[in-house]
A protein has these predicted regions:
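Beta-sheet-dominated scaffold domains
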Residues: 140-141, 147, 154-155, 186-297
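Short Gly/aromatic-enriched secondary-structure transition segments
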Residues: 155-168
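Flexible, glycine-rich phosphate/dinucleotide-binding loops
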Residues: 56, 99-101, 157, 221, ...
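Trp- and S/T/G-rich repeat-edge/linker motifs of beta-rich repeat architectures
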Residues: 2-25, 62-63, 105, 115-135, ...
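Disordered, low-complexity "stalk" and linker segments at domain junctions of extracellular
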Residues: 1-144
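Beta-rich globular "head" domains
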Residues: 146-152, 160-161
Length: 297
């Protein structure tokens, strides 16, 4: 990751993808007011560590299980764990039908379950391993709606990878998916054209070697279940990065000899544009633009 923190301060650092939080260790459970003459039920729990300021959550700890009578205000299970570095709070999940669901949050290292109903729609994060082998490294990157967005690997030239909201290096997901989870999808098209550029405007514009695509959401907010991708045209874009002037994209057509603009047009309700090289065609005939820059007045 290349960072510039001042006019002359640049740094290059290695990036580790996934949560920055470590799962709590030594998770254990104990029972209170147990009666051996009554029916027993098995209970299983996992715990995650949370950094409140970022919402970053670790993957689940190892599970702990215990048998007890049916839980109540007096018959309870207590779950304990060791503190995790950097954690502000801890989420506790209980298994029901083989699925761990959220039952509560603790700021300390102990939690009491007195028959709390688990929410199976809120489950612990699942770790994913991305970008760690040859042909799996992304070729283009940008930011959109507080997510880090990657596009195009050699193995998946039309695939988009979006981080969790606000956690730029975390591409973990949950099951079922949360709205803030990482988003991964492939542009479905009749041709395979590599993604070359990602341009954030009010929508995310995806420029490929063969076309222009609009990524948006049903309600305007990107989530794993709301992503929509719509074609805007099929002219394609060259390797040289596009330039954004105001709310208009200036980009090179696929072979690099034609300059086009791309902006939202109310009359067509889509992003469209014109060939700008016709204004001075003699300057570009037989030539390919390799690099360019724009200085705003």
């Amino acid at each position: 990751e290349v960072k510039r923190t001042s006019h002359t301060a640049w740094s290059i650092t290695s990036v580790s993808f996934g949560t920055a939080m470590t799962a709590p260790g030594s998770v254990a459970s104990s029972r209170q007011e147990y009666d051996s003459s009554k029916t027993e039920t098995s209970y299983s729990y996992v715990v995650t560590a949370v950094k409140t300021s970022t919402g970053d959550e670790s993957v689940a700890s190892s599970s702990t299980s215990i048998s007890n009578n049916n839980l109540s205000s007096t018959v309870t299970n207590t779950i304990t764990w060791n503190a995790a570095s950097g954690a502000d709070s801890y989420n506790v999940y209980k298994s029901r039908g083989g699925i761990f669901g959220f039952i509560g949050r603790a700021t300390g290292t102990t939690f009491k379950d007195d028959n709390i109903e688990s929410d199976s729609n809120d489950s612990p994060a699942i770790a994913r391993t991305l970008f760690n082998t040859t042909n799996e490294y992304p070729a283009t990157v940008n930011y959109y709606q507080q997510r880090l967005v990657f596009g195009q690997t050699n193995n998946d030239p039309q695939k988009i990878y979006m981080s969790q909201t606000g956690n730029y290096h975390n591409f973990n997901i949950s099951e079922p998916l949360r709205d803030s989870d990482a988003v991964t999808f492939t542009i479905a098209a009749s041709q395979v054209n590599e993604i070359r550029h990602l341009v954030p405007l009010s929508d995310l514009i995806i420029l490929t070697s063969g076309g222009e695509w609009l990524m948006t959401a049903n309600d305007g907010v990107i989530s794993p279940s709301s992503v929509q991708v719509k074609p805007q045209g099929y002219r394609g874009s060259a390797d040289a990065p596009p330039i954004v002037i105001g709310n208009t994209i200036i980009h090179l057509q696929a072979k690099g000899g034609i300059i086009r603009d791309l902006a939202f047009a109310l009359e067509s309700d889509s992003y469209t544009g014109n060939d700008l090289t016709v204004l001075a065609n003699h300057l570009f005939a037989g030539k390919t633009v390799k690099e360019w820059a724009y200085a705003q007045a």
